[in-house]
């Protein structure tokens, strides 16, 4: 175990922070920020693999497949976080993007001792959510050696699911199990081995790209507007009203009335206004173009 850890980039000592305990608060903050500035460049080296993954995920979404994140500790929490943001942002069903964490929901708020050390637990957890050959499994392990994640990837391969590995160590144990391997090398952490820092930031950046990219590819935005937003609070209600008002050129009051007619669906409301059809017809028109509003609006009205 010790020899394995010594070989991991994420476990190495960072020379830049060797004397960090003698620095002032301002110097500590500046040093952390300087190190964080390296993360985006590391993620950018993986752009082609991330883009390939985006297209695979979008294809699975189109055939009613799911995106499943699997991880332990920080990696698992980040997967659950990204998955939980998809329903309000893109009006997706909760089961379309799912985060699975070693130790279950309790592990979101506290460490569950030994949860990540059992590969067989991953098979059990994935079987519970009925992982299928139509799904994509993203195994997240910044170290690249977490038994729980390795077990999950092996199980996913055995049933024919598409596998993607995400690690911050280059030649890791996830690689031979992953059809696409994403490995941004962020280097040693400010606090040695504390992968909630740079590695965690890189992980969150990649997950943002995977879900956002795939959702854009399946028509969940209009330009850069989140027209499939589910308005679950006052902020999102106001955003929906403003978005509709700006896109179709009507007042805020008119936008509010139109949204009420369309059950709060911005995309439907846009079609109703521009194409002069009923909400029911607008929804069917969107289905006919696989939800791509820009494609629909480019079609002349009959």
UniProtKB/Swiss-Prot annotation:
Signal sequence residues: none
Pathway: Amino-sugar metabolism; N-acetylmuramate degradation
Keyword Lyase: yes
SIS domain residues: 57-220
Active site: residue positions: 85, 116
Alphabetical keyword list: Carbohydrate metabolism, Lyase
Catalytic activity: N-acetyl-D-muramate 6-phosphate + H2O = N-acetyl-D-glucosamine 6-phosphate + (R)-lactate
UniProt keyword Transcription, yes or no: no
Matches recorded under Pfam families: GKRP_SIS_N (PF22645)
Molecular function terms, GO-annotated: carbohydrate derivative binding; carbon-oxygen lyase activity; ether hydrolase activity
Gene Ontology biological process: amino sugar catabolic process; N-acetylmuramic acid catabolic process; peptidoglycan turnover
Function: Specifically catalyzes the cleavage of the D-lactyl ether substituent of MurNAc 6-phosphate, producing GlcNAc 6-phosphate and D-lactate.
Family according to the record: Belongs to the GCKR-like family. MurNAc-6-P etherase subfamily.
Subunit structure: Homodimer.
HAMAP family in the record: MurQ (MF_00068)
Miscellaneous section: A lyase-type mechanism (elimination/hydration) is suggested for the cleavage of the lactyl ether bond of MurNAc 6-phosphate, with the formation of an alpha,beta-unsaturated aldehyde intermediate with (E)-stereochemistry, followed by the syn addition of water to give product.
Name of the molecule in the record: N-acetylmuramic acid 6-phosphate etherase
Organism the protein comes from: Rhodopirellula baltica (strain DSM 10527 / NCIMB 13988 / SH1)
């Amino acid at each position: 175990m010790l020899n394995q850890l010594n070989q991991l980039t994420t476990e190495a000592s960072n020379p830049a922070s060797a004397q960090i305990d003698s620095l002032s608060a301002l110097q500590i903050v500046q040093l952390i920020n300087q190190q964080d500035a390296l993360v985006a460049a590391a993620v950018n080296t993986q752009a082609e693999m991330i883009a390939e993954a985006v297209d695979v995920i979008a294809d699975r979404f189109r055939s009613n497949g799911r995106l499943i994140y699997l991880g332990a500790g920080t990696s698992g929490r980040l997967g659950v976080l990204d998955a939980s943001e998809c329903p309000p942002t893109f009006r997706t069903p909760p089961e379309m993007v799912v985060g699975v964490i070693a130790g279950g929901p309790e592990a979101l708020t506290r460490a569950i001792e030994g949860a990540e050390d059992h590969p067989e637990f991953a098979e059990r957890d994935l079987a519970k959510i009925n992982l299928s050959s139509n799904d994509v499994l993203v195994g997240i392990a910044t170290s690249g050696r977490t038994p729980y994640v390795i077990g999950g990837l092996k199980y996913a391969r055995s049933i024919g699911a598409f596998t993607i590995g995400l690690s911050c160590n280059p030649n890791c144990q996830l690689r031979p199990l992953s059809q696409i391997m994403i490995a941004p090398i962020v280097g040693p952490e400010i606090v040695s081995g504390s992968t909630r820092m740079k590695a965690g930031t890189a992980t969150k950046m990649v997950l943002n790209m995977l879900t956002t990219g795939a959702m854009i590819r399946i028509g969940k935005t209009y330009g850069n507007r989140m027209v499939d937003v589910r308005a679950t609070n006052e902020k999102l209600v106001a955003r929906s009203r403003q978005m509709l008002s700006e896109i179709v050129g009507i007042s805020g009051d008119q936008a509010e009335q139109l949204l009420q007619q369309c059950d709060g669906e911005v995309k439907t409301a846009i079609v109703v206004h521009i194409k002069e059809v009923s909400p029911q017809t607008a929804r069917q028109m969107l289905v006919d173009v696989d939800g791509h509003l820009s494609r629909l609006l480019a079609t002349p009205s009959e």
